[in-house]
């Protein structure tokens, strides 16, 4: 650990000063450029290895492979203009108006509820997996731990 720190200290100390012949000047810039040049070359090699036909497809100037769009309406047989459609006529009949709040011959009354329920009996949902419904409507686990 001490050796690594001392070597790093010496390298930083020597990189601050320019050498007499200028070899140390812009050392990091040269390393940066060489790494980027190597990375670009590797990228181009991988592209040519996995996609060998990309350059051929980019330079393809065949007239049969080009797509042309029609500019005029003269040659548009595929897209026909829609025919004129007449809308259907609707007839309405008026019925006799109903009299609001008319007295009824049969009076209706609600039958009183004879049983009191707490709501669980009317629950129609199921229980989650591993639970079963009890007679009173609750969900209890099937296996007690």
Swiss-Prot record:
Disulfide bonds: 127-139
Organism of derivation: Mythimna separata (Oriental armyworm)
Function comment: Biogenic peptide that prevents the onset of metamorphosis from larva to pupa. Has repressive activity against juvenile hormone esterase. Induces cell proliferation at low concentrations and inhibits it at high concentrations. Mediates the spreading of plasmatocytes to foreign surfaces. May have a role in the regulation of dopamine concentrations.
Protein name per the record: Growth-blocking peptide, long form
Induction of synthesis: By parasitization and low temperatures.
Region of interest called Disordered, as start-end residue ranges on this chain: 46-145
Propeptide: 23-120
Outcome of mutating residue 126 to A: No effect on plasmatocyte spreading activity
Outcome following mutation: residue 125 to F: Significantly reduces plasmatocyte spreading activity
Effect listed in the UniProt record for changing residue 136 to E/L/N: Abolishes mitogenic activity and reduces plasmatocyte spreading activity
Tissues/organs with expression: Expressed in the hemolymph, perineural cells and neuroglia of larval brain.
GO biological process terms, semicolon-separated: hemocyte migration; positive regulation of cell division; regulation of synaptic transmission, dopaminergic
GO cellular component annotations of the record: extracellular space
The organism's taxonomic lineage, starting at the top: Eukaryota, Metazoa, Ecdysozoa, Arthropoda, Hexapoda
Keyword terms: Amidation, Cytokine, Disulfide bond, Mitogen, Signal
């Amino acid at each position: 650990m001490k050796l690594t720190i001392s070597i790093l200290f010496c390298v930083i100390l020597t990189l601050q000063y320019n050498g007499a012949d200028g070899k140390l000047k812009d050392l990091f810039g040269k390393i940066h450029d060489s790494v980027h040049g190597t990375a670009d070359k590797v990228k181009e090699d991988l592209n040519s290895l996995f996609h060998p036909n990309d350059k051929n497809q980019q330079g393809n100037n065949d007239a049969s492979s080009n797509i042309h769009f029609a500019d005029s309406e003269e040659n548009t047989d595929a897209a026909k203009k829609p025919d004129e459609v007449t809308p259907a006529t609707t007839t309405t009949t008026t019925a006799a108006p109903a009299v609001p709040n008319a007295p009824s011959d049969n009076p209706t009354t609600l039958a009183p509820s004879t049983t009191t329920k707490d709501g669980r009996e009317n629950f129609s949902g199921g229980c989650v997996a591993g639970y079963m419904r009890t007679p009173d409507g609750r969900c209890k686990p099937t296996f007690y731990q």
